[in-house]
Each structure stands twice: as structure tokens, then as C-alpha cells.
């Protein structure tokens, strides 16, 4: 993995941005999290009054546990999904178009070949990850290669002028990797991360088996690279590198599902400073995502009953950042609107009539 530096947020820009927010013609702190997100964007971009963000959406494809008993379709479904995404007519593309975001597709580890699909960037680490209950999911070399792919992708996006990235995944059995990475990093009891499904085993039985498998890989661990190599997947690895690279370029990252959340967990293990540059988006209702949010100390803010990946939630999260820019730039301050500022209460301490 390359050497990189993640700088802290630019406090002077944040302070000036917060003063403007507090002087907008609204009750103090009434826009809640939107205000904090906007203030943080000022610190990320080193701009007191950022505006007109340039968004990219990156969807990384990989199939999970391709040698495991659950693999009945052998990549056919994920191939169809990537072909559909490449057509440009997906829900994600529709949402991205509304906010002027460009969508990039990456094959990091789909089981079937995608080289015939126009527009899919070819960075295949392997034809899917292995089933971690049988052996390590990846190799250390694959992890190093995948992290470098993520860094290289964000290098290009930065050079192209993008300031924010919404991330997503596509692939079969992807929640299995997210589950294992989350348990492997957080150390939370496996039973808390599992949901009831049609499996013949009870949650307790599944938890016992999976916990034993993690222990065989010396997990849980705070070594993010080790976790990725033993129970991770190509998409999570590439997104981990992308998140770290984005932070080193002072670019914001929006994530959504448990799969993308697993990449955030791994990135935080490698460098905690990355969290200043990361924003959650949709609430998915999965125990795995709930555990990730608890461990990261953050909360999703979009509640739509989502059950879809493919970066749709992240794209909607980018639109929330846009809403913050509209608040900051389109609303008037008390001074601009020729309105008297508060003479008492909390507002009197923050509103200066600017």
C-alpha cells in the first residue's frame, strides 16, 4: 500500500462557514445535521463558502464465496446487473443525472468476464473471493493490489476535478463479506449481526459456526489488511483504498449499505483520520449496518426502507450535500435580507448582522 497523508479538517474555513450558517434567516441550529455536514464540507474543501460540488459515483463489482455451497448461479445474476448498469438506465443513473454526477463501473472480482461490456473498468483481482469458512477469502497480495487500485481510481477522479464520491457495490452474496468484515473488526457477537432468513439453521447455530471460522483466522483484529485478506472481498478492498485515497485528496465520500460500510470500517482501521471525510446516507435496516453505525459513532439520515445497493443510497446522500450547498449559498443572512438579528438568547451570541 502506498504512503499517504490524511490532513485534518481546515478549522478556519469551518468557523467562517458556521458563522454564516448561524447568521442565515432561520432559527439557530434549526437545520440540524444539514448544518454540520455543510460545515464539514467547508473543512474538507478548505473553502468558507463552498458551492456547486462535482460528484462522482463509483460502483465496484465482485462476487463472494464463489467456491461455497451457496453459489448456485455462478455469477450470472451479477453479470446481468453489471450489464444493466452499463446501459445507463438504472435507478442510480437516474438519480445521478439529477445532481450532475457521473457514474463509473469497476469490475474488481466478478466471477464471469465483463470485458465485453462497454464502460466497465477492468481491475479484476480474482474471479470472486473464496469462502472464508474453508480458507482465506483473498491473499495478502490481492489486498495490496486492490488497495492500490482504489488509490489509483481516486487519483484519476481528483485530476478530473471531482470533489465528492458516492460509493456502491454489485455482486452475489455480498452481505456475507460485509458480515464477516464487520464481525472481524468490531468484535461484536455474531448473533447480534445476523437476521432471520430461510436457512434451516437458527441464528444461534449460524453464529456459533461463523464465530469459530473467524477464530481460525485470528479474528477479531484491528489489522484492517489482515481482516480484508482473510474474510474480505475484492469490492470491499478496492473501496477501502478509494476511501483512504479520497481523504488524502480532500474529497468527501458518501456510503450507504453494509457492504460499503465494511470498507469504511477497514479504512478506519488503517487510518482513523479518514472519518472526517466520510458521510453515511440511507438506513438499510440490517443488523450488520446497525452495528457498523454503532461502532463508527455515526447515524444514517435517510429513511426510505431501502433494500437496494448499487450506490443508489449514496447518490441520494450526495443530493443531501447539495442541499447543504443551497442552504449556504441561496439563503440570505439577516444582514443581506435587512432583518434585525436576535437581541437575546443563543442567537444574540452568534448573529452579527453580516
Describe each PLM feature range.
Residues 1-354:
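N-terminal loops that bind phosphate or other acidic moieties
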Amino acid at each position: 500500500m502506498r504512503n499517504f497523508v490524511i490532513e485534518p479538517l481546515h478549522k478556519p474555513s469551518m468557523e467562517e462557514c458556521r458563522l454564516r450558517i448561524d447568521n442565515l434567516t432561520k432559527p439557530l441550529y434549526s437545520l440540524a445535521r444539514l448544518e454540520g455536514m455543510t460545515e464539514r464540507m467547508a473543512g474538507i474543501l478548505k473553502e468558507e463558502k463552498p458551492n456547486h460540488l462535482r460528484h462522482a459515483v463509483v460502483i465496484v463489482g465482485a462476487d463472494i464465496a464463489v467456491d461455497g455451497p451457496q453459489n448456485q448461479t455462478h455469477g450470472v445474476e451479477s453479470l446481468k446487473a453489471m450489464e444493466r448498469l452499463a446501459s445507463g438506465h438504472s435507478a442510480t443513473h437516474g438519480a445521478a443525472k439529477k445532481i450532475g454526477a457521473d457514474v463509473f463501473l469497476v469490475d474488481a472480482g466478478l466471477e464471469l468476464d465483463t470485458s465485453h461490456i462497454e464502460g466497465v473498468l477492468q481491475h479484476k483481482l480474482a474471479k470472486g473471493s473464496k469462502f472464508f469458512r474453508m480458507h482465506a477469502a483473498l491473499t495478502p497480495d490481492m489486498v495490496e493490489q486492490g488497495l492500490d487500485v482504489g488509490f489509483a481510481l481516486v487519483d484519476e477522479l481528483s485530476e478530473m476535478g471531482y470533489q465528492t464520491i458516492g460509493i456502491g457495490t454489485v455482486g452475489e452474496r455480498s452481505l456475507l463479506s460485509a458480515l464477516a468484515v464487520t464481525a472481524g473488526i468490531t468484535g461484536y457477537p455474531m448473533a447480534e449481526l445476523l437476521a432471520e432468513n430461510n436457512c434451516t439453521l437458527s441464528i444461534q447455530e449460524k453464529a456459533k459456526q461463523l464465530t469459530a471460522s473467524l477464530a481460525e483466522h485470528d479474528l477479531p483484529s484491528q489489522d484492517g489488511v489482515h481482516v480484508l485478506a482473510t474474510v474480505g472481498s475484492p469490492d470491499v478492498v478496492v473501496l477501502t483504498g478509494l476511501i483512504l485515497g479520497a481523504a488524502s485528496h480532500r474529497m468527501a465520500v458518501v456510503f450507504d449499505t453494509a457492504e460499503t460500510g465494511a470498507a469504511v470500517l477497514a479504512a478506519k482501521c488503517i487510518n482513523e483520520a479518514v472519518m472526517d471525510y466520510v458521510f453515511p446516507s440511507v438506513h438499510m435496516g440490517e443488523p450488520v449496518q446497525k452495528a457498523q453505525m454503532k461502532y463508527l459513532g455515526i447515524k444514517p439520515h435517510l429513511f426510505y426502507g431501502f433494500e437496494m445497493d448499487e450506490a443508489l443510497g449514496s447518490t441520494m446522500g450526495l443530493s443531501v450535500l447539495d442541499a447543504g450547498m443551497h442552504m449556504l449559498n441561496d439563503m440570505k443572512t439577516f444582514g443581506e435580507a435587512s432583518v434585525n438579528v436576535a437581541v437575546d438568547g443563543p442567537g444574540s451570541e452568534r448573529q452579527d448582522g453580516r
